[in-house]
Amino acid sequence: MKACFMGLGYIGLPTAIIAAKHGVEIAGVDINAQVVEVTNQGKLHIIELGMEEMLREVLASGHFKAYTEPQVSDAYFMVVPTPFKGDHEPDVSFVESATRMVLPLLKEGDLYVIESTSPVGTTERMASLIFSERPELEGKIYIAYCPERVLPGNVIYELVHNDRVIGGMDEASTRKVMEFYGQFVKGTLHPTNSKTAEMCKLTENSSRDVQIAFANELSFICDKAGINVWELIDLANKHPRVNILQPGCGVGGHCIAVDPYFITAEFPMESRMISTARETNNYKAFWCAEKVRNAMLRFELKRGRKPAVAMMGLAFKPDIDDLRESPAKGITTKVLQSCNNADIMVVEPNVSEHKLFKLTPYKEAYEKADIVVFLVNHREFAGLNYRDDVEVLDFCGTFKK
């Protein structure tokens, strides 16, 4: 079987490589010619431990090659971004564009699968698009929705071992698509329909967002009450039926920070708690930025000079290079905009350069800083010795003080 993966980003490329590793002939497609070029050279354009070696293996074996245009295949997977537009309205234009690209290639017996996080009903809408353009294919191809559920930084393991939800447009589609994923997924494959599978993905990430909002709300309360929130949560979690997550500087990434809007946009009256959680997590970044600005003002009033500030971390979570929807990046931007010529050192050990920020090595920034702001709990920061001689704003629990 030959499979065509539309999109070679943080999910599409690893999934394509894993499938190729298990013997599937893969055509990986991306409209970014530079991504295609470096991928075919065996270089990974994302950070994912162990994945570059695997990419070189599947290129050498002939099971994988990247292209800028879709190739004739037996299965087509839409793994493209689904951002939001306007007032947090879901934008499925990339899914539609990728679908239109493969439309001329579809033939009887082919699989068409959406992995991109999508609003409920997207698979049905794409099926209608396909059949309106290619009516001869109705009832003759297999269409399903199968959401990814992996953690960046642990993708190789999770793509293989995590359970997957397979939501077909009909039972035959579900069975056929389960057969494909069964070639490389060791986790259990759970059959359902496409709308339930779409809602399942949105529910998983919205659930995480609500739980993080509770932790972030505790951080507001503890800050005002003079309580160490990290100690509080650790003690509360000693209860056998309590499992509070860790607070942070907000919620980022292209899943948890985005997916709840796919629910609230379509079901606004029925999703008030989900909406409030989004507001809480968005507010946390503004709260953190204000804390930094206040610390800078106190320093200047006390010392009579501008402080040197180390902003530690830009990624949306630890130990990755993904800055999408990152609250740390937003906080850093706000601090830079109001720094009044203070020395702001921006640190991100997983990124070599950035078009907006001048990056400083983390040890250098930590040693020079008058104020240290921990935004992301990268593994490199764990090896630093706590400094009692400067103000440390720890928004991610690096030292839990």
Language-model regions, residue ranges each:
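Structural/interface elements that position substrates and couple domains in central-metabolism enzymes
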Residues: 1-401
